[in-house]
């Protein structure tokens, strides 16, 4: 059985588009072949936690990303023992999650971009080069989102 950690850097809420799509995929997966655990910085509603736990998965609440070092090292520790990480994010700032996974020895690092712009353009540009070298597979919710963060090629 493969162990996958899904990290959500945006809000993990039942009515959000990202959560809806992600949970639809999760519900369809064969949980005898793959164990998927979730982590985010917010406290999701009990209805989501109940569904996750009822399916044999775990949820981990991470500290705020604003405390960069504490967040990074806690995530690195959590990543140990997982075969893959799938990070849902909106910018190259997800380099923190990807680098924590690298430091923890995770070989498969999937990034999933959900936006075509960033609120932090300067930081996005600053981290973009390292970010693009930190994932093994890239996914985007649209061509526009993919081209904005990954360039013209190399994403699905």
Briefly describe each language-model feature range.
Residues 1-156:
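Membrane-interface segments of envelope glycosyltransferases acting on lipid-linked substrates or membrane lipids
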């Amino acid at each position: 059985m493969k162990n996958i950690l899904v990290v959500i850097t945006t809000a993990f809420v039942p009515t959000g588009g990202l959560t809806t799509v992600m949970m639809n995929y999760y519900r369809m997966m064969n949980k005898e072949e793959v164990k998927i655990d979730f982590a985010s910085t917010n406290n999701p509603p009990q209805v989501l936690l109940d569904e996750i736990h009822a399916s044999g998965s775990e949820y981990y609440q991470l500290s705020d990303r604003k405390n960069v070092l504490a967040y990074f090292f806690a995530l690195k520790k959590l990543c140990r023992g997982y075969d893959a990480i799938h990070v849902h994010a909106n910018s190259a700032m997800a380099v923190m999650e990807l680098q924590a996974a690298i430091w923890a020895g995770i070989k498969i690092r999937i990034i999933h971009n959900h936006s075509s712009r960033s609120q932090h353009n300067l930081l996005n540009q600053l981290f973009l080069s390292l970010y693009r070298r930190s994932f093994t597979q890239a996914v985007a919710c649209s061509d526009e989102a993919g081209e904005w963060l990954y360039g013209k090629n190399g994403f699905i």
